Amino acid sequence: MNLHRISSEPKCKCLNHEIQNARLHYGRFAVYPLFPGQAITIGTAIRRALLGEVHSTCITSAYVVGASHEYSTLKGIRESIHDILLNLKDIVFKSDTLERQEGILLFNGPGIVTAQHIKLPPVVQVVDNTQYIARLEMPTSIEIHITLENTKTCTSLNTMPTTKGRFILDAALKPVRNMNYSIHSLGEGDMRQEMLVLEVWTNGSLTPQEVISQASQNLNDLLKPLLKVERYFQAKQNIHKKRMFTPTQSENLNMDQIEMIGGNKLIDQPLLPADSHLNSSLSLNIDNLVHLEGISIDDLQISVRASNCLKKVGIYTIRQLLSYTQQDLFQIKNLGKKSVEQIVIAIRKSYGHILG
């Protein structure tokens, strides 16, 4: 392979940018020239980052004055409380702040209530003022107090008081509506190169250029630790036969991992039900592990709810989390059995450690 056949550094060029409506932006980008095989590597990584790791601001809770429960109705209003909440959940906002913000909706009927009637702080803007909320069919009023948060720092699921008329909304609104990529050949034979074409659709809270930039930065941050690889482990040659895992217990550990664990003590202690294959705990010397103090729990593939529960009790890094046992996790408020199992499995898969 001729490593010098690419004469210039790869670059990204915007081929097209269309605003089809307030909540639908389209962008088309080309990344070139690339070595064969690089396009699919970048395309796969950027697609996952775009669809799962780009954040935006949305409504996370709403207090509806006069509402008794989610399926109740208010006199003179066509929609039920449930329908109103669904409409609020779909409203698209634009904001640069990560701080929690408050807004209020006051409207006197009759008339149609839309997103333009929400009073917001200057740091938050509504993308589409025409988004429908409700219809008041008689001279009545509606009052809704809303809380807005960035999905990156959302904590409302755990910290909002459970008062009558307050409803928690799932912060699931993503700025990237869809993403496709295609790979095209440039040149022939030994001079063959590749071009990666990215197509991105957003909801208007961020432009296609902005989400590409944010996703790329997230990938860059993820790979930074690999630029500073150090030798944190000293391999041990012998492992006592009595302390070896059985095939069932060690099916997810390869020999290199076992050798790195070396002579560390293996503790036979039940963690999860027998069918989970997590019936052995690995006691590791945390000081000999990689520098986990600077690695956020956000790097774990766990739900936002589980992550927020951990942060609420002061667990922000992997190293802090590894000091907890499974029983300790069960004591954390709002952290259920399913979330604990999710955390235990994520720690085992990512760091080869089983919580006691």
From Swiss-Prot:
- Work out whether the entry's keyword set contains Iron-sulfur: no
Describe the function of this protein: DNA-dependent RNA polymerase catalyzes the transcription of DNA into RNA using the four ribonucleoside triphosphates as substrates.
**Which compartments is it annotated to reside in?**
Plastid, Chloroplast
Domain-level remarks: The N-terminal domain is essential for RNAP assembly and basal transcription, whereas the C-terminal domain is involved in interaction with transcriptional regulators and with upstream promoter elements.
The EC number of this protein is: 2.7.7.6
Give the record's subunit note. Answer: In plastids the minimal PEP RNA polymerase catalytic core is composed of four subunits: alpha, beta, beta', and beta''. When a (nuclear-encoded) sigma factor is associated with the core the holoenzyme is formed, which can initiate transcription.
Q: List cellular component terms (GO).
A: chloroplast; DNA-directed RNA polymerase complex; mitochondrion
GO molecular function terms noted in the UniProt entry: DNA binding; DNA-directed RNA polymerase activity; protein dimerization activity
Q: Does the keyword Chloroplast apply?
A: yes
Q: Which family does it belong to?
A: Belongs to the RNA polymerase alpha chain family.
Protein's name according to its UniProt entry: DNA-directed RNA polymerase subunit alpha
Record field: catalytic activity: RNA(n) + a ribonucleoside 5'-triphosphate = RNA(n+1) + diphosphate
Alphabetized UniProt keyword annotations: Chloroplast, DNA-directed RNA polymerase, Nucleotidyltransferase, Plastid, Transcription, Transferase
Region (Alpha C-terminal domain (alpha-CTD)) spans which residues? 267-356
GO terms under biological process: DNA-templated transcription
